[in-house]
Regions:
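Alpha-helical transmembrane segments
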Residues: 191-208, 240, 271-277
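Hydrophobic alpha-helical transmembrane segments
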Residues: 53-65, 157-163, 180
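Short amphipathic alpha-helical coupling elements at transmembrane boundaries
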Residues: 23-26, 82-89, 109, 116, ...
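Alpha-helical transmembrane segments and their helix-start/interface "positive-inside/aromatic belt" motifs
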Residues: 1-10, 80-100, 203-213
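Alpha-helical membrane-interface segments at transmembrane helix boundaries
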Residues: 44-52, 84-88, 92, 141, ...
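Non-cytosolic segments of integral membrane proteins
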Residues: 94-186, 220, 224-277
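Hydrophobic transmembrane alpha-helix segments characteristic of membrane transport
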Residues: 58-94, 186-200
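Binding/recognition "hotspot" determinant
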Residues: 1-58
Length: 278
């Protein structure tokens, strides 16, 4: 690495960005069971198991309310076809509550398969690192003390922007993982609503929302791939321009590309919800 302070500051900001991008790539290919050593998942599974008791109680409640609202009289309940329909609904709802964790992990694994297919098709095993062009390093190193003063200001502003954007992006990806945990922990309660016909929309909405959170990972991977292709063709640097102009032009275009990626990551939940009509 160069001994120049301006170059070091810019390179440190880019290193932060590259490390966060690599961390995102690693998180998106991980299962909730293995995330952070699996300690969080064990607690979530325990909470899920404890809430199953409440889920079974609500299952009976939703079932009774559903029978009362859908049947005009007790005579209808005694009809074989109607009784069979009610029994099948209750059995399915109980199965969904009992095996809710397995159902949700199956959904997650399907989406992970989609994400892996996108990565393999695009030919990306990891993200491309963003590096400082040699022309800028040489121009900055050739600057005198007074010429480098405006460069310090430009570098500080640019480095701060890049660092802030990298943390905003990683927070969005971590937020998705936390939502996966929240959905998994509380799943028995909304899934119990399948026992009653009037309340079944609660369960449907819950599963749709969970699927949307899972699909966010695929959207984020697509955004990272597009940004990596941008990074392969870095901003054009005019070698005849002044050092300050070169740095300012490079940082401006780079931050614009980064803003596009951060915006895509932040809006991934909205994009998915529009896709599946939530």
């Amino acid at each position: 690495m160069s001994d120049n302070w301006v170059v070091q500051n810019l390179q440190n900001a880019l290193d932060t960005w590259n490390s966060k991008l690599a961390e995102i790539w690693q998180i998106l290919t991980q299962s909730p069971e293995n995330f952070k050593g699996g300690g969080i998942w064990q607690v979530i599974v325990q909470i899920h198991g404890a809430l199953q008791a409440i889920g079974y109680a609500l299952l009976v409640l939703f079932f009774v309310v559903g029978v009362v609202k859908t049947c005009g009289s007790f005579t209808e309940v005694k009809r074989p076809e109607h009784a069979l329909k009610i029994f099948i609904r209750f059995a399915i709802a109980k199965g969904v509550v009992t095996y809710g964790l397995e159902l949700m992990m199956a959904l997650f694994n399907i989406v992970q398969g989609v994400t892996s297919t996108i990565m393999k098709t695009a030919g990306f095993g990891s993200t491309e690192d963003t590096v400082l062009p040699d022309e800028i390093i040489k121009a900055v190193e050739d600057c005198g003390f007074f010429e480098s003063i405006p460069l310090w200001a430009v570098t500080l502003i640019g480095g701060l922007f890049i660092t802030v954007l990298s943390f905003i992006m990683i927070m969005s990806v971590y937020g998705r993982f936390f939502r996966l945990y929240l959905y998994t922990a509380i799943a028995p309660i909304p899934l119990s609503s399948f026992a009653g016909e009037p309340s079944q929309n609660i369960g449907k909405s819950f599963l749709k929302s969970y699927a949307a959170v899972c699909l966010e990972g695929a959207i984020v991977v697509l955004a990272c791939i597009i940004f990596s292709l941008f990074a392969e063709s870095p901003p054009v640097v005019d070698p005849d321009a002044a050092a300050v102009t070169m740095v300012w032009s490079y940082i401006g275009e780079l931050i614009f590309n980064m803003l596009v990626l951060v915006g895509a990551v932040k809006m991934s939940d909205r994009v998915v919800r529009e896709m599946i009509g939530l």
